[in-house]
Amino acid sequence: MGKIVQPRQVPAIDRRGFLAGFTASAALAGSGAMAADLGRARTVSIFHTTDLHGRIVPTSTYEGLDDVGGFARCATCIRQWRRESPHSLTVDVGDVVQGTPVSLESGGTLMIDLLNRLGYDAWTLGNHDFDWGPEKLETLFDRSASPVLTANVVRGAAMPGGFDGAWKRVLPWTMREIGGFRIAIIGLITPGLPYWLPPELLGGAEATDPAVALAAAVKEARGEKADAVVVTGHMGWRFNDDYANPVRSILRDVDGVDVYLAGHSHQNQPSWTLHDVLCSQASYHGIHCGRIDLTFDLDSRKLVDRRAFTILMDDRFDLDPAVMAAAQPGLEAAEVTLAREVAKVTRPISGKGRGNGLATLLCELFSATLRRHGKPVDAVFHGTFATGDLQPGPLTVADCWKIIPYENMLVTAEVTAADLLAIVAEDAKQKDSDRTLWPFEVVAGDGGAPARLRHQGADVPADRRLTVALNAYDAQSGGRRLMKTREILAAPAANRRTSPIDTRSALIDGLLDRGVVG
């Protein structure tokens, strides 16, 4: 289960004020670039998106603001900016493909084709770009017309710039000469990968210390006479650094960076400064598009000004016709798929609290699907994504996407009943968790801690070995919330296996098999 960090509330927008502000910003950016060339300065602009997650058409914010975002609107904005600014670059900061049926059906190639169509100069790997496994990822590399920038990833003894096969496309950094100035772009990925993704999906790739990799890349880029260094980092704004977003410490420890473009944390942060580095983050799903303006003195070649802002992609931006023409067949096919009915719900099914009906239903369906694939289990440990109750009526594929928004693989392992108790006890400390250990009853001891398991009215011996299924995200630690679980499953005796079955597919298959739930 991937945790999505909620962005700050988008304030109410006064239409007239926004239009005036946007027009002024656009005019300033455009006239500023041209006026700079008339004097003894020149502006190089960098346009950036991040965490598109396969969104092509408008969507909603987490707070419910509708009809915003989508790559098709970002494309319109970027084309407009390019007309205003003759010297520009366009980059994406990761998590490009995972998140929508239309992207999933194409294996992500549609999104990469759209980046190619718009002439992106580079994109950076995000953690969710690994979700579909190494074969799909390598297809994306082969498809990409631009380099994939990630300095802090290794494969065995090989480093970026020294990979073979499709991975040749992955470089630590690239240099682009724009308007006579050399702009180095260095990519970084979050070091949180091993706490979310199993080795089978990473395909031998490992994230290394981003500060060490960045320092080496900056040294190389400056040695190649870079006039400015821009970092595209799939690590984002947080109130404080954490294991997945150590942005403050990285920029504190590494000199020579002028701009940091952030991703991963799904925040709209138009402009902030850390250790004299200008930072910007353009939210998620194309809801904002970001722009950096770097102004250089033409005589000294020094960087004399840096500015950053983001723009809300609402209905003031048309859907780009070229993007829509390329995406339309896939969008129409996805619409048909999403409308497919998979089951009928006969009565409300609760989705709140530990042991809720929806979590229990998921566990039952996962078990049944694994059994049909010759992988029977004794237990399933899983929860919901806080999507609420299921109401009576038809249940469609679209509903299944809301219930399970990620393609997390099912993992099986052989553990003792005592191990399962330890797993449940660890999860009990997570106040927002509704994970359920099906089909067991967890009996609390003195103090309320889980003390024993019961099944069909009898205690389960602590040393009994049982095969349990859970999703790969939880098996890897659930974002470091389940480190004891990770340790238990990593033991050789657990015989841990990652199945080729993802949880949403298991849900859909199980519902189709049942036909009626409730």
Model-derived features with residue positions:
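Acidic, metal/ion-coordinating pockets
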Residues: 2, 19, 35-315, 357-368, ...
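Catalytic centers of hydrolytic enzymes
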Residues: 40-64, 69-77, 83, 196, ...
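N-terminal secretory signal peptides
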Residues: 1-13, 21-27
